[in-house]
């Protein structure tokens, strides 16, 4: 059972990562850059997470390996086949118009761009990303719409019928456009691919040439066309809804940038607001960097005081107002959770040692943490390990995929309880990149970060040095178990209190009044914002 990277697994080093970020930004910011280029997801380096980096490993190889050859030569052929298949589907099945409920003929005050990740989210009163804010604004007399990017297999009609009678308009984007529109998208992507191929011939540094060559192939990827498709529909909808403000989730993805550009093409005076909803990691990149004016937000709404500070420290964002807005990821107290976060939470006064194991929404991260904890469970039968999954992953699918995890020991439990209930019965939290550790610390658990050899840290608590454990092997985990909780890394009671305080500022409750003020002030600011933006060619979306 592996608890460290296999020999054939290759990591990108930190210097390589920084070089990659710089090169991709150079391509995106080039004078000949187009909206199609900005739509290439591969050029937007999100962060240093192992789940994001494998697709970049091949470009750092000294010799052209099989993976790079596949990406540059075989992949375009596959993508062209997918394009023909999608084009054929548009001929035999009519693409529906937007199925809209409760649409107003008057201009809207605010339009949210959100996501439907799971069928269970359909019909819920509160939005997964924006919580009760859309409803609160509607109750205060503002006209509100939510545009959904649909990640489920449910039809737009069935999704929107679930909200029939709601005071908030809901619109689901189509996954396909008409035959002419799909053909036009592919033609534009192909033209950008050709431009990048031509650009490659004029470049000298070998790494930059490889990145441009890969970008030329990525221009024809389905992810690029999906981003362009989203932008095309956003442009149409914004022209119809005519909102004062557009609010989108913001993590640094390409579709967020082209959505802003598309909205501004339809309404140059619209105010674009970005909601930073995910944790920021040490080397998180694309959310912290500036592109040309059409693609940048006018405001950034931070999920907490910590992320506001981290974003304000980004040199390229100094011209953008950054305000604390809040997050839906607030721990909901239950009877099993300690109500007042204090340093005494770290004391172990329960007779049962339960360790909560919380991976991210990523298969490889589930494998890493669960396989590691399985080894620990074999060595430490007195410790109970509570395996918890992201809501979008099931144990049935996980165990079907990874047979090694079927050999569980009696001291491993597959949890079907809420996060709050699991936190309330555990004393330890084994984690890697998940922000659930923030709620765990607030609930009194001792955080234990699993660091894999050869990789950059993905610890969301990277700014904190004391009050947590860092382990690399099951042996180190066992040694940690024998360490009194009041001597964590030499931390004092004050250090542990500061960790709890840090986590209390990581996410804060959402304050709809922050956004309401932006909406109310939008008419006065619109003319000034339009004039201040650098005059650039409009987006073709």
Task: Please tell me what each predicted stretch does.
Residues 1-541:
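Catalytic-core helical/loop segments in enzymes performing group transfer/polymerization on anionic/lipid-linked
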């Amino acid at each position: 059972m592996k608890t460290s990277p296999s020999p054939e697994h290759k990591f990108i080093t930190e210097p390589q990562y920084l070089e990659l970020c710089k090169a991709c930004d150079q391509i995106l910011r080039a004078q000949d850059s187009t909206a199609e280029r900005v739509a290439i997801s591969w050029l937007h380096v999100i962060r240093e997470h192992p789940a994001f980096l494998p697709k970049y490993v091949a470009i750092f190889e000294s010799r052209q390996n099989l993976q790079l050859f596949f990406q540059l030569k075989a992949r375009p052929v596959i993508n062209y086949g997918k394009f023909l298949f999608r084009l054929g589907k548009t001929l035999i099945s009519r693409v529906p118009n937007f199925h809209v409920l409760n649409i107003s003929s008057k201009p809207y005050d605010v339009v949210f761009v959100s996501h439907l990740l799971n069928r269970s989210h359909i019909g819920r009163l509160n939005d997964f990303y924006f919580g009760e804010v859309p409803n609160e604004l509607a109750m205060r007399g503002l006209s509100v719409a939510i545009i959904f990017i649909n990640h489920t297999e449910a039809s737009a009609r069935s999704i929107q019928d679930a909200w029939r009678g709601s005071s908030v308009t809901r619109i689901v984007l189509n996954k396909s456009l008409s035959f002419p529109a799909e053909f036009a998208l592919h033609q534009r992507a192909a033209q950008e691919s050709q431009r990048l191929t031509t650009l490659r011939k004029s470049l000298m540094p070998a790494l930059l040439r490889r990145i441009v060559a890969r970008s030329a192939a990525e221009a024809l990827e389905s992810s690029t066309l999906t981003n362009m498709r989203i932008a095309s529909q956003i442009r149409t909808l914004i022209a119809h809804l005519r909102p004062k403000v557009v609010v989108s989730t913001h993590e640094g993805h390409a579709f967020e940038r082209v959505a802003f550009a598309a909205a501004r093409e339809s309404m140059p005076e619209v105010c674009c607001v970005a909601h930073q909803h995910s944790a920021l990691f040490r080397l998180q990149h694309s959310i912290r960097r500036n592109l040309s004016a059409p693609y940048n937000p006018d405001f950034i709404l931070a999920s907490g005081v910590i992320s506001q500070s981290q974003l304000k420290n980004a040199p390229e964002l100094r011209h953008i107002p950054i305000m604390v807005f809040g997050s839906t990821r607030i721990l909901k107290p239950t009877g099993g959770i300690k109500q007042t976060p204090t340093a005494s939470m770290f004391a172990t006064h329960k007779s049962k040692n339960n360790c909560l194991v919380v991976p991210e929404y990523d298969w490889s991260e589930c494998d890493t943490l669960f396989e590691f904890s399985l080894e620990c469970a074999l060595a430490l039968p007195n410790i109970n390990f509570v395996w918890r999954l992201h809501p979008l992953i099931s144990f049935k699918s996980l165990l079907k995929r990874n047979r090694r995890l079927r050999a569980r020991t009696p001291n491993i439990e597959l949890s079907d309880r809420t996060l709050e209930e699991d936190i309330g019965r555990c004393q330890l939290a084994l984690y890697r990149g998940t922000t659930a550790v923030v709620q765990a610390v607030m609930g009194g658990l001792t955080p234990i970060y699993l660091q894999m050899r050869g990789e950059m840290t993905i610890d969301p608590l990277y700014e904190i040095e004391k009050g947590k454990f860092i382990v690399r092997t099951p042996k180190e985990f066992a040694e940690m178990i024998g360490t009194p909780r009041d001597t964590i890394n030499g931390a004092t009671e004050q250090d542990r209190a500061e960790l709890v305080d840090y986590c209390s500022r990581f996410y804060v409750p959402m304050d709809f009044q922050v956004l309401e003020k932006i909406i109310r002030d939008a008419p006065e600011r619109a003319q000034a914002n339009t004039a201040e933006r650098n005059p650039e060619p409009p987006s073709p979306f």
